[in-house]
Amino acid sequence: MGKQKIRIRLKAFDHRILDQSSEKIVETAKRTGAAVSGPIPLPTEKSIYTILRSPHVNKDSREQFEMRTHKRLIDILEPNPKTVDALMRLDLPAGVDIEIKL
């Protein structure tokens, strides 16, 4: 595998498990001899939902909820087959969305 790059995008609502997952991926890639760039923090996506507090009247009384999606980007440069195999066997916590591009 010459001059190839694996790009991994991680998304999660909780930044702590996102950082733990990215550290696991970086450590695994470095242990197998690949060069790693990252984890690079990407902008946090914030979704705001506004609802009425009352089921009947009082439109002026509203409540807002927000959901933050934290993102990280990891580039693995010059991966070897051992790196790919180790990443496939890696066990990451639930709640982390992983997107891998070769």
From Swiss-Prot:
<keyword id="KW-0687">Ribonucleoprotein</keyword>
<dbReference type="GO" id="GO:0005840">
    <property type="term" value="C:ribosome"/>
</dbReference>
<dbReference type="InterPro" id="IPR027486">
    <property type="entry name" value="Ribosomal_uS10_dom"/>
</dbReference>
<protein>
    <recommendedName>
        <fullName>Small ribosomal subunit protein uS10</fullName>
    </recommendedName>
</protein>
<dbReference type="GO" id="GO:0003735">
    <property type="term" value="F:structural constituent of ribosome"/>
</dbReference>
<comment type="function">
    <text>Involved in the binding of tRNA to the ribosomes.</text>
</comment>
<dbReference type="InterPro" id="IPR036838">
    <property type="entry name" value="Ribosomal_uS10_dom_sf"/>
</dbReference>
<dbReference type="Pfam" id="PF00338">
    <property type="entry name" value="Ribosomal_S10"/>
</dbReference>
<comment type="subunit">
    <text>Part of the 30S ribosomal subunit.</text>
</comment>
<dbReference type="InterPro" id="IPR001848">
    <property type="entry name" value="Ribosomal_uS10"/>
</dbReference>
<dbReference type="GO" id="GO:1990904">
    <property type="term" value="C:ribonucleoprotein complex"/>
</dbReference>
<dbReference type="InterPro" id="IPR018268">
    <property type="entry name" value="Ribosomal_uS10_CS"/>
</dbReference>
<comment type="similarity">
    <text>Belongs to the universal ribosomal protein uS10 family.</text>
</comment>
<dbReference type="GO" id="GO:0006412">
    <property type="term" value="P:translation"/>
</dbReference>
<keyword id="KW-0689">Ribosomal protein</keyword>
<dbReference type="GO" id="GO:0000049">
    <property type="term" value="F:tRNA binding"/>
</dbReference>
